[in-house]
Regions:
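Structured catalytic-domain cores with a bias toward divalent-metal coordination
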Residues: 2-463
């Protein structure tokens, strides 16, 4: 590229980036939670809910979130609580998935599952919604007149602690729930099925000495220059598809789906198998999995997988189209996807994605149910992508330095089961957990509304 043309390209990228960041600063008041204004949710004429300070619902680290969740569940007398250990940190503290089961009339009203933290850092939003729901005046107190309610808190505790989406093995847990033999799937999956390798120089640039990730020039300008020719050749949707489809051949890359089932998901699948009374034998099941990142700022998009194996015995007799208008729109959601091929702009590019957790359970469930991901928007998609690329570069460089130092992140005692887990992503917190009073309030209101709508639907559609 001629030097004059290169200079023009650089200037355009710099100006564009500056304008974009200036535009989106209005969404980020950068107020770390100390005291938020009260918020009110009017669900219907009889049910109005309020929270004096949403900051009390949010946490800044995993251990704080876990402590708040456990304290909230202890306020109830008849609740079954337990934890699945996933890892142990250097201070001998367990990093766990915490489970709370609020018993209900399962044979008549079914089961509702609410999960947070599958993507680690995104769990701070899900945890806040769960705490808001656990206030005494929100959940129906009569066990005979409600479904069984299950909260799964921090499905990816290591990612939540490290402020990353991936887990302790750099695996994206929402690409890891593969049906059948995973080894066969990995061996037969084309590594470039979604053009991941075509975008490699942007998604996973060669940076052997950590020069690029430490360069302000690369982080603000250079990476865009790296990307522009690829965007010109393939387009933005192709870039998004290359990222979100997941890949199974590069353990150091982004959206890595792994080559074996990860401990977190093994715990959840075992829980499913061991409690048929709550899952397999339940006449209906609604599963809400909370995510952040895609879509309009502070608003929720719904990606759902209806399970209607036998319409004649369906718990939810509505067609997917009727559910779309009667169920999801009343939950304040702005976009939704019924199945592959019928997708909103938020979920464009996911047609090749495999291993999604809600999709997995929708397929193994043998009755009628609704399995959905509720996604709260933060930044524009390409800025989310920027954060993911930079975080992975820094994380891999950090791990490489630890390896060269000879400790590999293992504690001084040499116990391979106890890891440091001291990495904290400086990029993904802002991308997936923006410090904004507006965003915090919107997430709580919309997250609670969807859960209440699910409860309402379950009790109105009993057999």
């Amino acid at each position: 590229m001629p030097s004059f043309t290169r200079l023009i390209v650089v200037q355009v990228v710099v100006i564009f980036t500056a304008v974009l960041y200036n535009f989106f600063t209005k969404f980020f008041d950068n107020t770390v939670c100390s005291k938020d204004p009260p918020i009110t949710l009017k669900f219907d004429e009889q049910h109005v809910y309020s929270w004096d300070d949403t900051c009390q619902l949010y946490s800044l680290d995993y251990k704080e979130a876990r402590g708040k969740f456990q304290a909230a569940t202890r306020l109830y007398e008849n609740v079954e609580t337990f934890s699945f250990p996933v890892a142990i940190d250097s201070s001998n503290e367990p990093l766990t998935i915490d489970v709370a089961i609020f018993p209900g009339n399962t044979p008549e009203y079914g089961t509702i599952v609410h999960s947070s933290g599958l993507h680690g850092v995104e769990g701070y939003a899900g945890s806040a919604i769960q705490l808001a729901l656990l206030q005494k005046d929100v959940l129906p107190l009569s066990e005979n007149n409600r479904p069984t309610i299950i909260f799964l808190h921090a499905l990816n505790p290591v990612g939540m602690q490290e402020h990353r989406r991936s887990n302790e093995n750099n695996v994206d847990l929402n690409r890891n729930s593969i049906h059948g033999n995973m080894e066969d799937f990995v061996n037969h999956r084309d590594p470039n099925i979604a053009n991941y390798e075509s975008f490699r120089r942007f998604l996973h640039p060669t940076d052997p000495d950590g020069f690029l990730i430490e360069s302000p020039w690369y982080r603000t300008v250079g990476m865009w220059i790296n990307l522009l020719p690829l965007l010109y050749q393939y387009g933005f949707v192709a870039l998004k598809r290359a990222m979100v489809s997941g890949q199974y051949h590069d353990p150091r890359g982004i959206f890595y789906g792994g080559n074996e089932l990860q401990p977190s998901l093994q715990h959840v699948q075992n829980f499913w198998d061991q409690r048929p009374d709550l899952f397999r034998d339940s006449p209906s099941l609604v599963w809400i999995d909370i995510h952040t990142g895609l879509g309009p700022f502070g608003k929720d998009s719904i990606h759902y997988y209806p399970s209607f194996p036998n319409e004649t015995i369906s718990r939810f007799p509505q067609t997917p189209a009727e559910l779309q208008s009667q169920y999801f729109l009343t939950s304040h959601s702005v976009t939704m996807s019924v199945k592959e091929g019928e997708t909103s702009d938020t979920f464009v590019g996911y047609d090749l994605s495999k291993g999604l957790m809600t999709s997995y359970f929708a397929e193994v469930y043998n009755s009628s149910g609704i399995f959905l991901a509720q996604e709260f928007g933060t930044l524009p998609a390409f800025l989310v992508g920027r954060g993911l690329v930079l975080d992975n570069m820094l994380y891999q460089e950090t791990k490489q330095r630890e390896k060269k130092a000879g400790d590999g992140g293992i504690t001084q005692s040499g116990d391979s089961d106890r890891q440091d887990y001291s990495y904290r992503s400086p990029y993904l917190s802002k991308v997936f957990f923006p410090q904004s009073t507006t965003w915090r309030a919107s997430v709580v209101k919309r997250g609670v509304a969807l859960m209440l709508q699910s409860l309402d639907l379950s009790t109105k559609t009993k057999t």
